[in-house]
């Protein structure tokens, strides 16, 4: 079983990843996630960082400055992680379509994006910030996590997930970041047999961060199918219960996210950083 797992992770470590980011700081966060998710020892994933702007009126000097400003944090993170990184800067009318074209033409295995604000334009970032401020004035008694959930998830995350999940020719990972760093307590939901494919990723995250791993297993999935590893905690339940306070990363399939989390605002407000995976 250990050998099978190593072979699986070795394949992941050679994965060709497109990391698409908008805000400069989010690029560094997504690179840390990708490295933790796919690195196996000294074997790193093959990552291309993509930033897209929709402003076609910028001149070459401005474009060079935008490039430097946009990629500085992720290049710094790549150096710290010793993670090889290619970069690509594109000017396009539609961000999502440009990402899809690159995925299709260059045959990537995995797309990684963030869920906090829309993919690329600074204007969208400013609109999101303005919405948060307006929401805070009307809902000042609510914690920021609740406000972030209502805004970031419902107004932006659904459309982004649906577009890429249904149109991308590869697997998709979407990070809902709550100050994502190096998680120490990871929770993964295995609600069906197909969700067993999440385990190698969750286990690699746990191993690379020296973290604990808790598996929430549906009663419809045979416990023996987990090939459980020492130190893992397994909880068998069909109830969608509160996320433990100490948990700092949730891993969940896109299907289960749609069925459960996306319809429960109270649970959304509790979520720590969450990785939503649609594996193909």
Residue ranges and their predicted role:
Residues 34, 74, 99, 161, ...:
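Aromatic/hydrophobic pocket-lining residues that form π-stacking "cages" and hydrophobic walls in ligand
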């Amino acid at each position: 079983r250990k050998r099978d797992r190593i072979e699986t992770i070795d394949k992941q470590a050679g994965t060709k990843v497109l990391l698409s980011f908008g805000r400069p700081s989010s690029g560094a966060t997504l690179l840390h996630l990708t490295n933790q998710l796919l690195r196996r020892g000294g074997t790193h994933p093959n990552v291309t960082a993509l930033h897209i702007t929709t402003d076609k009126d910028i001149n070459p000097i401005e474009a060079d400055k935008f490039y430097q400003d946009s990629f500085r944090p992720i290049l710094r993170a790549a150096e710290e992680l010793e993670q090889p990184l290619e970069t690509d800067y594109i000017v396009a009318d539609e961000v999502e379509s440009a990402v899809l074209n690159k995925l299709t033409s260059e045959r990537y295995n995995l797309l990684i994006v963030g869920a906090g604000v829309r993919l690329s334009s600074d204007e969208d970032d400013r609109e999101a910030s303005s919405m948060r401020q307006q929401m805070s004035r009307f809902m000042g008694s609510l914690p920021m996590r609740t406000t972030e959930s209502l805004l970031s998830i419902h107004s932006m995350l659904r459309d982004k997930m649906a577009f890429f999940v249904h149109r991308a020719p590869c697997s998709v990972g979407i990070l809902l970041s709550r100050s994502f760093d190096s998680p120490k307590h990871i929770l993964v939901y295995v609600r069906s047999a197909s969700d067993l494919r999440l385990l190698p990723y969750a286990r690699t995250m746990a191993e690379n961060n020296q973290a604990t791993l808790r598996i929430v297993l549906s009663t419809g999935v045979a416990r023996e199918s987990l090939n459980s590893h020492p130190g893992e905690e397994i909880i068998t339940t069909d109830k969608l219960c509160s996320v433990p306070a100490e948990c700092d990363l949730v891993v969940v399939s896109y299907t289960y996210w749609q069925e459960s989390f996306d319809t429960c605002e109270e649970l959304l407000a509790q979520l720590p950083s969450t990785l939503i995976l649609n594996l193909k």
